[in-house]
A protein has these predicted regions:
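A polyampholytic, Gly/Pro-enriched intrinsically disordered region
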Residues: 121-132, 191-206, 285-294
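PAPS-dependent sulfotransferase catalytic domain
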Residues: 4-232, 236-247, ...
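PAPS-dependent sulfotransferases, especially Golgi type II membrane carbohydrate sulfotransferases
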Residues: 1-68, 211-219, 223, 227-241, ...
């Protein structure tokens, strides 16, 4: 059988069918991934006449074959986050730099990162599939691509060790924010992980104390565990912590050497930062104070109980030394030991 050619095609969905994992592909041509989220780019691509007329569905073998025939870029930066903390702004800023391919929460990646929760035997092929998926996304469709930045879903913090084993030399960032502001944002517009049972099997399911959490405390409990997981990464030297309030200046400030920011690009990045990351047609408007004022006493109490301690632990981490070459791993800050305690 002649191997399939996926030039200018990208995987848009990974799913299990009749006991085997399948991929849906769509043709993107040479159009860059320019929207705030990968799913937005997929929506645009599926409106193209070509994709209305022709779709491709394959097994994982085709993905592995394509990786062998046309190796793509490997990740140059992994971005973990708590959600609602500026990760989309970071992605949009890096997307504005020449040669950068930015994957923003692609659902096929999330599906493969969490496949072992559904099928324990998947651990035999999961890592290879994730690497092959990155290769497919890292194809040089425009010809000038040099870096592949991957922004994970917030709950993929619990799969961070798999990614660190695959890419131990790749720098990682962990973005976080005052948990009260995150919880209020999730109350306004809940994400998949903000509603128990909606996300499906994930690392949140096996966390201790879940049964004892009152329904009204779930968001604060969930955000607290995301902060704790991020702290663990940063304290072990596996990621650099970045508070929302440091954005966007940190990108061309102390993180500039790590991210390879050319000083000549700063005016352009500053202009991009002035737009709303999720609604680029609108100007950015800070909302932290409004979110804090919106929180009622019960929400404040839940955040203090479940999320304040890991947030303070992150704030207490020493700043990382500057990195002069983004192709090398991050130097490790002093190790820390932290356990989240419900007061």
């Amino acid at each position: 059988m002649t191997p399939l050619d996926f030039t200018e095609w990208l995987p848009i969905r990974a799913f299990e069918q009749a006991g085997s994992w399948q991929l849906d592909w769509a043709w993107f041509g040479t159009a860059p991934l320019a929207r705030p989220f990968f799913s937005d780019d997929v929506d645009d691509a599926l409106r193209l006449p070509f994709n209305l007329a022709l779709r491709r569905q394959t097994g994982l073998d085709a993905l592995f074959d394509w990786q062998a025939r046309s190796p793509g870029l490997e990740p140059s930066l992994l971005v973990f986050h708590t959600s609602r903390c500026g990760s989309t702004l970071l992605a949009q800023l890096l997307r504005a730099l020449p040669g950068h391919v930015v994957l923003s929460e692609p659902p096929p990646l999330d599906a493969l990162l969490r496949v072992h929760y559904r099928d324990p035997t998947a651990s035999a092929w999961q890592a290879d599939a994730v690497r092959a998926l990155f290769s497919a996304y890292g194809q040089r469709r425009c010809g000038d691509e040099t870096r592949l930045v991957v922004k994970l879903d917030a709950w993929n913090l619990f799969e961070a060790q798999l990614l660190r084993r695959l890419y131990p030399e790749v720098p990682c960032l962990f973005l976080y924010r005052d948990p009260l502001e995150v919880v209020v944002s999730q109350r306004r517009q809940p994400g998949l992980h903000a509603v128990p049972g909606l996300l499906g099997p994930s690392g949140l399911d096996g966390l201790p104390g879940r049964e004892a959490v009152a329904p009204g405390d779930y968001l604060a409990w969930m955000v607290g565990h995301l902060l704790q997981a991020g702290f663990g990464l940063c304290a072990a030297g596996e990621a650099v912590a970045l508070n929302y309030r440091e954005l966007p200046d940190a990108l061309w400030g102390h993180l500039g050497p790590l991210l390879g920011i050319d000083p000549a690009a700063v005016p352009h990045l500053q202009a991009v930062a002035g737009r709303d990351a999720k609604r680029p047609g609108q100007a950015f408007s800070a909302d932290g104070e409004a979110k804090r004022n919106e929180a009622d006493e019960a929400t404040r109490a839940a955040v203090e109980r479940w999320a304040r301690a890991p947030y303070q632990a992150l704030e207490a981490l020493p700043p990382p030394p500057l990195v002069n070459d983004a192709s090398h791993s991050l130097p490790k800050p002093p190790n820390g030991d932290f356990s989240m305690v419900a007061n």
